[in-house]
Amino acid sequence: MIFFKQIQQHGDNFSYIIADEDTGEAAVVDSSFNAGEIIKVLKAKKLRLTYIINTHGHSDHTAGNAELTSMFPAKIVAHKLSRISFDLAVEDGDLLTVGRIQLKVIYTPGHTVDSICLLVDNEKLLTGDTLFVGECGRTDLAGGSSKSMYHSLFNKLMKLDDDVEVYPGHDYGVKTSSTIGEEKKFNYTLQPRSLKDFIEFMAEP
């Protein structure tokens, strides 16, 4: 049975714990600032942390990596272009297994060059700072690209089934999770636009 927990962090960040309760194996996605809360849950559920997966290299998503690796023999996972310290490099289409749970890596540059999303058993999508509830990630920071964001959103994420659940990296929306279908319908950044129009839209103040 899958154990899935969204943890509210400081600064509107979310961390996630994904575990196979039958095997006790677990992964943390985006350790963020409060590793202590993550450790508390892992110990209470008697879980073995095998992976710490970062959706991208910004410090508000990676700040807890060192504390978690000091407590658990877990591998830090990041996209191969990431500049953070990691043990396992991944790229588009790679599969990670946590017990019997499959995590599919979807490479989604745009917010950063190393941004990834994770599709959990084809049911849940952890989107980091690529897609939020009602918003998408900004592209005006170092390594950002509106052109890449367009292709990540429209040619990758919006091709997933409408009932796939969306779990973002920040609590920026009217609720803490959504679905691909709901985002297609209600997210103003995902309304049909040409690439040129999207780039102009993202440049608006």
What are these regions (language model features)?
Residues S31, T62, M149-L153:
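Aromatic/hydrophobic pocket-lining residues that form the small-molecule binding cavity
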Residues L47, Q102, T112-P205:
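Metallo-beta-lactamase
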Residues M1-K45, C117-G128:
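Conserved beta-strand hairpin/beta-sheet module of binuclear metal-dependent hydrolase folds
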Residues I2, L81, D94, I101, ...:
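Well-ordered beta-strand scaffold positions
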Residues I7, V90, I180:
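Hydrophobic residues at beta-strand termini and immediately following loops
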Residues I18, D30, H56, L68, ...:
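Divalent metal-coordination and catalytic microenvironments
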Residues G11-D12, T23-A26, F33-K104, K185-T189, ...:
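Active-site HxH/HxHxD metal-binding segment of metal-dependent hydrolases
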Residues Q6-Q8, D87, Y107-P109:
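Short Gly/Pro-enriched turn/cap motifs at secondary-structure boundaries
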